[in-house]
Amino acid sequence: MSIDQRLQLITRNAAEIITIDELRKKLESEEKLKGYIGFEPSGLFHIGWLIWTQKVKDLVEAGVNMTLLRATWHAWINDKLGGDLSLIKMAADYTVEVIKNYGVDTTKLNIVDADDMVKEKDYWALVIKVAKNASLARIKRALTIMGRRAEEAEIDASKLIYPAMQVSDIFYLDLDIALGGTDQRKAHMLARDVAEKMGKKKIVSIHTPLLVGLQGGQRMSITEGMEEDDIQAEIKMSKSKPESAIFVSDSREDVERKIMGAYCPKGVAENNPILQILKYIIFPRYNFVKIERDIRYGGDVEFKDYEELERAYIEGKIHPMDLKKATARRLNEILEPIRKSLERKPEFEEMIQKISKSVTR
């Protein structure tokens, strides 16, 4: 695979690369690059996470040595699953199982547990050094990476450790690339700034889009005056808002019901969850999407790329109901092997029930 091909694969469907020039230089160096994503085991896996899962798959295929950090302690600090570490660890196992059955070759991933990292005194020394090189105001601004607002830091002082831990994860693992959703931008920018002060390697940040919740843009009125990345974090699909999300363990019928009830105004692309599912989840997996229609309405039509489909939708050539039916059909095809895998393992069924009762913000 050429450098241009690797670059195209790595950047496909990314919301932001900081910076593209630095990424190209790293690829041109011909050194084996190391990347990572850290995930909080915080509940059921919804389809929004498939966006970064696909990007992990892309990075592995592009020859990047990827680390998957099971951020158990981070989830504990963030009060996920009621702060129950045993349940958090179960959720981590479940998440890795989903990633595997999505099609990521987990044998090519370096899977790291935060539980192991925090046992090392060098790790905590690094956390302190990072904190010493960041202002308190900057740390508090970065709390949005946890789904928290700056003022919420007063609730529990441990929250202030979180951003320094995330930056330390990056330095401790000696990474070239940090992958995350756009809600992780503040942490990655903090890592880049602190790297200069500490003489550490400056990461390239790859930010994937946050999938808007099924309610779409209907909640935009509450986001006035917020920064763009914070707006996207506010309206994203969230496991703590089950009505806004499709979970990978949902039945075929539930997926169809949720898709058919989702926000999808005729001719509108902005904050349209159905179009986003097609763009970020379905088209990266399939070469085409078929819209089945009665012959009275033009008959079946196929689209080989997302841009062509979006244009047709904006121009009113595709009805929302037809779009939703096609989306539900393709999405269920993607989710079927994941569902079957989870059904084959009773421990995951029991865990899903426990997690469903324990999901916190």
From Swiss-Prot:
<keyword id="KW-0030">Aminoacyl-tRNA synthetase</keyword>
<protein>
    <recommendedName>
        <fullName>Tyrosine--tRNA ligase</fullName>
        <ecNumber>6.1.1.1</ecNumber>
    </recommendedName>
</protein>
<dbReference type="InterPro" id="IPR002307">
    <property type="entry name" value="Tyr-tRNA-ligase"/>
</dbReference>
<keyword id="KW-0067">ATP-binding</keyword>
<keyword id="KW-0963">Cytoplasm</keyword>
<dbReference type="InterPro" id="IPR002305">
    <property type="entry name" value="aa-tRNA-synth_Ic"/>
</dbReference>
<feature type="short sequence motif" description="'KMSKS' region">
    <location>
        <begin position="236"/>
        <end position="240"/>
    </location>
</feature>
<dbReference type="InterPro" id="IPR023678">
    <property type="entry name" value="Tyr-tRNA-ligase_4"/>
</dbReference>
<keyword id="KW-0547">Nucleotide-binding</keyword>
<feature type="binding site">
    <location>
        <position position="239"/>
    </location>
    <ligand>
        <name>ATP</name>
    </ligand>
</feature>
<dbReference type="GO" id="GO:0004831">
    <property type="term" value="F:tyrosine-tRNA ligase activity"/>
</dbReference>
<keyword id="KW-0436">Ligase</keyword>
<comment type="function">
    <text>Catalyzes the attachment of tyrosine to tRNA(Tyr) in a two-step reaction: tyrosine is first activated by ATP to form Tyr-AMP and then transferred to the acceptor end of tRNA(Tyr).</text>
</comment>
<dbReference type="GO" id="GO:0005524">
    <property type="term" value="F:ATP binding"/>
</dbReference>
<dbReference type="InterPro" id="IPR050489">
    <property type="entry name" value="Tyr-tRNA_synthase"/>
</dbReference>
<dbReference type="InterPro" id="IPR014729">
    <property type="entry name" value="Rossmann-like_a/b/a_fold"/>
</dbReference>
<feature type="binding site">
    <location>
        <position position="162"/>
    </location>
    <ligand>
        <name>L-tyrosine</name>
    </ligand>
</feature>
<comment type="subunit">
    <text>Homodimer.</text>
</comment>
<feature type="binding site">
    <location>
        <position position="169"/>
    </location>
    <ligand>
        <name>L-tyrosine</name>
    </ligand>
</feature>
<dbReference type="GO" id="GO:0006437">
    <property type="term" value="P:tyrosyl-tRNA aminoacylation"/>
</dbReference>
<feature type="binding site">
    <location>
        <position position="166"/>
    </location>
    <ligand>
        <name>L-tyrosine</name>
    </ligand>
</feature>
<dbReference type="Pfam" id="PF00579">
    <property type="entry name" value="tRNA-synt_1b"/>
</dbReference>
<keyword id="KW-0648">Protein biosynthesis</keyword>
<dbReference type="InterPro" id="IPR023617">
    <property type="entry name" value="Tyr-tRNA-ligase_arc/euk-type"/>
</dbReference>
<feature type="binding site">
    <location>
        <position position="184"/>
    </location>
    <ligand>
        <name>L-tyrosine</name>
    </ligand>
</feature>
<dbReference type="GO" id="GO:0005737">
    <property type="term" value="C:cytoplasm"/>
</dbReference>
<comment type="similarity">
    <text>Belongs to the class-I aminoacyl-tRNA synthetase family. TyrS type 4 subfamily.</text>
</comment>
<feature type="binding site">
    <location>
        <position position="36"/>
    </location>
    <ligand>
        <name>L-tyrosine</name>
    </ligand>
</feature>
